[in-house]
């Protein structure tokens, strides 16, 4: 499978990439894109999409004084509008019969039940299903959703799970490595991979600058997208030889 992690704010996306590397995730793409163009390109691609939406952060008041200072009724409404827009974009990227999960860390009904109710009115192709979360408590107005208050062991979290009943699957282009890949470097890369890995089949190796990357399978076309990383940073070219990168060993364990 493929894990695609996107964060629009660039410095947060850099932290996201660091976490992906630290956790040794091999099959990931990390991007820093506005949701709309990204989801337009990847329409119908994902079986599961999680929207951890930017919110007013009422659940963070105890831990973050800045969240208290930033709060206002207008901010709540602004967040709800932005959340609805993000959900509209994310809905495009969900494959038929796929799952869309929406979560926040705020108490505001405008950002939780209100956003989901309005989304369902705009998107009859989606249905609300049970969240599957067994702790916390059901919402009074949308019992399939879940609220997790501090007395439940959370920080005011909300989660809703939706399923797409109709639509078209991904029909876009698939990733093809550029033609200017060095045959000699490819050969060296495969030899290095087999000397370090017990796996029989070597993943697709992408040469980009002085680095080699091991790409995930079934990768869509990445042309023009703000990609921070696709796959695993495998090796670096130094003086006509390859040195394995730290991330490869992190991902191999």
Language-model-detected regions and their locations in the chain:
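Class I S-adenosyl-L-methionine
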Residues: 128-153
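Helix-to-beta-strand junctions that scaffold the AdoMet/dcAdoMet cofactor pocket
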Residues: 94-96
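Polybasic, low-complexity RNA-engagement segments
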Residues: 155-158, 165-253
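Mobile active-site "lid"/loop adjacent to the S-adenosyl-L-methionine
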Residues: 11, 48-86, 105-112
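Residue-level signal for inorganic ion chemistry
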Residues: 3, 16, 49, 98, ...
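Local beta-strand N-terminus motif with an aromatic residue
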Residues: 45-47, 124
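Conserved Class I S-adenosyl-L-methionine
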Residues: 113-135
């Amino acid at each position: 499978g493929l894990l695609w992690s996107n964060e629009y704010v660039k410095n947060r996306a850099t932290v996201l990439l660091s976490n992906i590397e630290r956790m040794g995730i091999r099959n990931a793409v990390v991007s820093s894109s506005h949701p709309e163009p990204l989801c337009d390109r990847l329409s119908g691609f994902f079986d599961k999409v999680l929207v951890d939406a930017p919110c007013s952060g009422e659940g963070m008041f105890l831990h973050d004084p800045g969240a208290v200072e930033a709060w206002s009724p207008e901010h709540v409404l602004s967040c709800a509008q932005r959340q609805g827009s993000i959900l509209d974009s994310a809905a495009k990227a969900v494959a038929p019969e796929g799952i869309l999960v929406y979560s926040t860390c705020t108490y505001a009904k405008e950002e939780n039940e209100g956003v989901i109710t309005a989304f369902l009115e705009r998107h009859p192709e989606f249905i609300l299903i049970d969240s599957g979360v067994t702790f916390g408590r059901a919402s009074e107005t949308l019992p399939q959703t879940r609220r997790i208050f501090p007395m439940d062991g959370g920080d005011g979290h909300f989660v809703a799970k939706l399923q797409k009943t109709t639509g078209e699957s991904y029909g876009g282009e698939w990733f093809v490595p550029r033609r200017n890949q060095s045959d000699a470097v490819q050969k060296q890369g495969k030899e290095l991979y087999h000397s370090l890995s017990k796996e029989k089949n070597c993943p697709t190796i992408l040469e980009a600058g002085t680095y080699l990357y091991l790409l995930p399978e079934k990768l869509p076309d990445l042309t023009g997208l703000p990609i921070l990383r696709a796959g695993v940073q495998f090796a670096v070219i130094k003086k006509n030889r390859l040195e394995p990168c730290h991330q490869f060993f992190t991902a191999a364990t």
